[in-house]
Each structure stands twice: as structure tokens, then as C-alpha cells.
Amino acid sequence: MKLILTAEVDHLGEPGDTVEVKDGYGRNYLLPRGLAIVASRGAQRQADDIRRARELKTVKGLEHANEIKTALEALDTVELAVNASADTGKLFGSVTATDVVAAIKKAGGPNLDKRTVALPKAHIKSLGTHSVSVRLHPGVEASVSLNVVAES
């Protein structure tokens, strides 16, 4: 059975792709859930529109990611004040991706999603300067220097 996908399906394809599947899989799973439509001339035109929209969205997303990367690289060092032991310099708790996003926003940087921030380890648990990477788009990654200091 020849179908055109209207949504992303794992191990099969993305919206707008024309795929060949077994009849039962198409009739019992893809078509009832609205994940695909039967391939025809009109449906092929619709698939071309979906594909063009997806490509345009990818290009716009890449341009936006590059703008955010430029804004992040313009920041020298982002400073984050946290509760820490005066003797050992160890933190009471840890610095998470949410804390990093708030510090970047406070330093005048762009508003980011916490899921884009990749910490060197799961959490930062010591004072000092740490390099944090931000994944903005597939292929576009920015690096931010984060200086963790003790609150006074």
C-alpha cells in the first residue's frame, strides 16, 4: 500500500514522505490515527506543500539559531551567585540547567529553553568557571562561560 505521511512516524519517515507499507499496517494503524493518507495525485500535491513548509521551517529555525548563537557569544562570562560553604567552596545543592538559563537571562542574554542547555556533568557542584554548551539547532551549538561564585 502506498501512503503519504502527514506526521512523523518512527522508523518510517517524516511528513510529506511517500512510503510503501503492508496493507494491514496502513489500514489498521496509520490511516485511522491520521498519520498518513492514501497516495493519489491530489495527495501528492498536498505532500509537496507539506515538504516545502518543512524545509522553510528548517531554514527559518537555522537563521534564528544563528542569531541566538551570536547573542550568546557576545556575553563574556555569565556570573551565577549560589549558596556555598565559605571553608571548602562546595555548593549547598547544585547548579542545574534552569539556574543557567536564569543567569543567562539576567546577564542580558536571550530567553532559552532549559532542555537546550548541556551541563558538563548532570549538575555543577563546585565554585569556579565552567563551560556550558547550548544546543540551539541540529548543527548549531554555542558555548557559554559560567562563573559560579558564592553569595555574599
UniProtKB/Swiss-Prot annotation:
Record-linked InterPro entries: Ribosomal_bL9, Ribosomal_bL9/RNase_H1_N, Ribosomal_bL9_bac/chp, Ribosomal_bL9_C, Ribosomal_bL9_C_sf, Ribosomal_bL9_N, Ribosomal_bL9_N_sf
Cysteines engaged in disulfide bonds, as pairs: none
Gene Ontology MF terms: rRNA binding; structural constituent of ribosome
PROSITE patterns: RIBOSOMAL_L9
Keywords from the named record: Ribonucleoprotein, Ribosomal protein, RNA-binding, rRNA-binding
GO cellular component: ribonucleoprotein complex; ribosome
Family the UniProt entry places it in: Belongs to the bacterial ribosomal protein bL9 family.
Biological function: Binds to the 23S rRNA.
Protein name: Large ribosomal subunit protein bL9
Organism: Mycobacterium sp. (strain KMS)
Gene name in the database record: rplI
